Design a protein with these regions (language model features):
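Active-site/ligand-binding-proximal alpha/beta "capping" segment
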Residues: 178-226
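Amphipathic alpha-helical repeat scaffolds
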Residues: 29, 113-120, 229-232
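Glycine/small-residue-rich loop that forms an oxyanion/phosphate-binding "nest" at active or ligand-binding sites
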Residues: 65-90
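Boundary-proximal intrinsically disordered activation/regulatory segments immediately upstream
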Residues: 1-53, 139-140
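RNA substrate-binding interface of SAM-dependent RNA methyltransferases
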Residues: 38, 93-182
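Active-site regions of enzymes building and remodeling cell-envelope glycoconjugates
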Residues: 59-69, 104, 175-176, 190-196, ...
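Structured adenosyl-cofactor binding patch, chiefly the S-adenosyl-L-methionine
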Residues: 84, 126-128, 139-156, 208-248
Length: 248
């Protein structure tokens, strides 16, 4: 049975502070929830319609399942159109070491504010096989319901961590490619298989204090009249250039 207290708790998890205090976050949608058993995420409770429960009776055998009506699901959902099931999950422990980054290509996000952009970038990283995204502590929270939904499940396969970029970059030994307005032409730049791609804030770009760590400032050459590209599109274009150069 869905109690008022539980419904209130779920709705409170739209705020980062409440997620951190409770240690819980929300995952919605049949597709993403179906991927959870194979992930590192620990599910506390499931709230689902009878149709979903009947079709997935073998999933989550050790998890508390609460049957809800479509109307009840609508009351607790963060989606305009709820998708049969909502999972209440425990926030995972952050796992991060600068040494891990030294053997691969990773993305670094400086003060990225928009949840949609973060979700898109996580999905892009997953598409190109990039395993790590390192975010400044003031970037959008990956466990925001909007971010989770925008990733379409990719947050389960990409390790997203929050740390001091100044400290991390000071320890890093790889080349750092920073997306800036007046850098080297992306298509004339050699991007090795191992390195860091830094994407800055949507409005102000990479923080001036971090630019000293950017060994290779790069720019996507403009052909038309658009003023700029959003962070997600810029990340996709640069990741594609990296993938093409390092295709086996």
């Amino acid at each position: 049975m869905l109690t008022k207290a539980t419904a209130k708790l779920i709705q409170s998890l739209k705020d980062k502070r409440n997620r951190q205090e409770s240690g819980l976050f929300v995952i919605e949608g049949a597709k993403i929830v179906a991927e959870l058993p194979a992930s590192k995420i620990t599910v506390k409770s499931l709230f689902a319609t009878r149709n979903w429960l009947d079709a997935n009776e073998k999933l989550f055998s050790d998890v508390d399942k609460v049957e809800v009506t479509e109307q009840q699901l609508k009351q607790i959902s963060f989606l305009q159109t709820p998708q049969q099931v909502l999972a209440l999950a425990h926030l995972p422990q952050q796992e991060f070491s600068v040494n891990e980054l030294q053997s691969q290509f990773s993305i670094v996000l400086d003060t990225l504010q928009d949840p949609g952009n973060l979700g898109t970038i996580i999905r892009i990283a997953d598409w190109y096989g990039i395993k790590h995204i390192v975010c400044s502590t003031d970037s959008a929270d990956v466990f925001n319901p909007k971010v989770i939904q925008a990733t379409m499940g990719s947050f389960l396969r990409v390790n997203i961590v929050y740390t001091s970029l100044e400290t991390m970059l000071a320890e890093n030994k790889l080349p750092v490619f920073g997306a800036v307005m007046n850098g080297e032409n992306l298509y004339r730049t050699t991007i090795p298989s191992k390195g860091l791609l830094m994407i800055g804030n949507e409005g102000s770009g990479i923080d001036q204090g971090l630019l000293k760590y950017v060994s290779n400032p790069i720019t996507i050459p403009r052909q038309g009249g658009a003023e700029s590209l959003n962070a997600g599109i810029a990340t996709a274009v640069i990741c594609d250039a990296w993938a093409r150069q390092n295709a086996s």
